[in-house]
């Protein structure tokens, strides 16, 4: 609880998370962790990150999270100040309480209570660039870890995975995300003289019909069906008597493990080609692959730890948006479990203190079960 309040009271609107990282670093240094602050500034804005470890042997269990937060909006709209860390009627208020300073605080408390593993290591990967472009955060830290030969055996990410109550859901994977732009060129002209123009809109409509006529798939063992949404159609035309010279459509696909990034791109192009219309297709940078940590000893360890405290075995899920787990998957198996996500990014973001206490207990059980299983 003390860590959660201290983190909330350290304003850290992305990417300015240095004060909140200081809270984590100071606590870990005092407990004997070797702490490294990693600053990257590819995008021109310095971003502070942290990697800390106690122990030198395997297995290395890592907790990954972020202490940057989205802007609070109008502070006057909050029941308590967004960075107050106020507690009222057993509820902790503040930006980041759920997403995800609460989980960072809970694992920090759990790890310090456990101490140094007799065999193996505990580590923390905490970023200040998850709510922003995610360029100079976890992705760069993962590259840095790989370059120095740092081995992480398993990772738990503290995203707010539970839809309704603590213990509902553990994320064992995430869908991939791909965004694209379709451009159709025409020739601008007067609507009264269509023979002198070339309207691109009907051709774009035919292309979009071909793209969306059939489902991409029917889902897989652990993933729902892939889903393509057309999110914008634009012609840049406000007049009623002008045929536009070009038309564009933007789309996003959330896709499962039946596709790789390359095979999905090929399928999109194949569908568009069936329309028989000329088009230009471009894909936006920043696409991510789907990933899955298959059920096995690590996933079971997490599920058992949750059940130990809540009395219920959580659902394994791959729903929702992307997270920094998409970067960590290249290092090791990764699973996500944190608080209830109902108020994340909202005015009056809050979590019951009882949930924080229970999450800390879950993380304590997870650490104990992990080393009993993997360090034996």
UniProtKB/Swiss-Prot annotation:
Pathway: Amino-acid biosynthesis; L-lysine biosynthesis via DAP pathway; LL-2,6-diaminopimelate from (S)-tetrahydrodipicolinate (succinylase route): step 3/3. It holds the Pfam family Peptidase_M20. Its EC number is 3.5.1.18. Signal peptide: none annotated. Transmembrane segments: none annotated. Its cofactor is Zn(2+); Co(2+). GO terms for biological process: diaminopimelate biosynthetic process; L-arginine biosynthetic process; lysine biosynthetic process via diaminopimelate. GO terms for molecular function: acetylornithine deacetylase activity; cobalt ion binding; succinyl-diaminopimelate desuccinylase activity; zinc ion binding. Binds 2 Zn(2+) or Co(2+) ions per subunit. The active site is at 68, 130 (proton acceptor). It catalyses: N-succinyl-(2S,6S)-2,6-diaminopimelate + H2O = (2S,6S)-2,6-diaminopimelate + succinate. Zn(2+) 1 binds at residues 66, 99, 159. The keyword Zinc applies. Belongs to the peptidase M20A family. DapE subfamily. Homodimer. Catalyzes the hydrolysis of N-succinyl-L,L-diaminopimelic acid (SDAP), forming succinate and LL-2,6-diaminopimelate (DAP), an intermediate involved in the bacterial biosynthesis of lysine and meso-diaminopimelic acid, an essential component of bacterial cell walls. This is Succinyl-diaminopimelate desuccinylase. It comes from Azorhizobium caulinodans (strain ATCC 43989 / DSM 5975 / JCM 20966 / LMG 6465 / NBRC 14845 / NCIMB 13405 / ORS 571). The lineage of its organism: Bacteria, Pseudomonadati, Pseudomonadota, Alphaproteobacteria, Hyphomicrobiales. The gene is dapE.
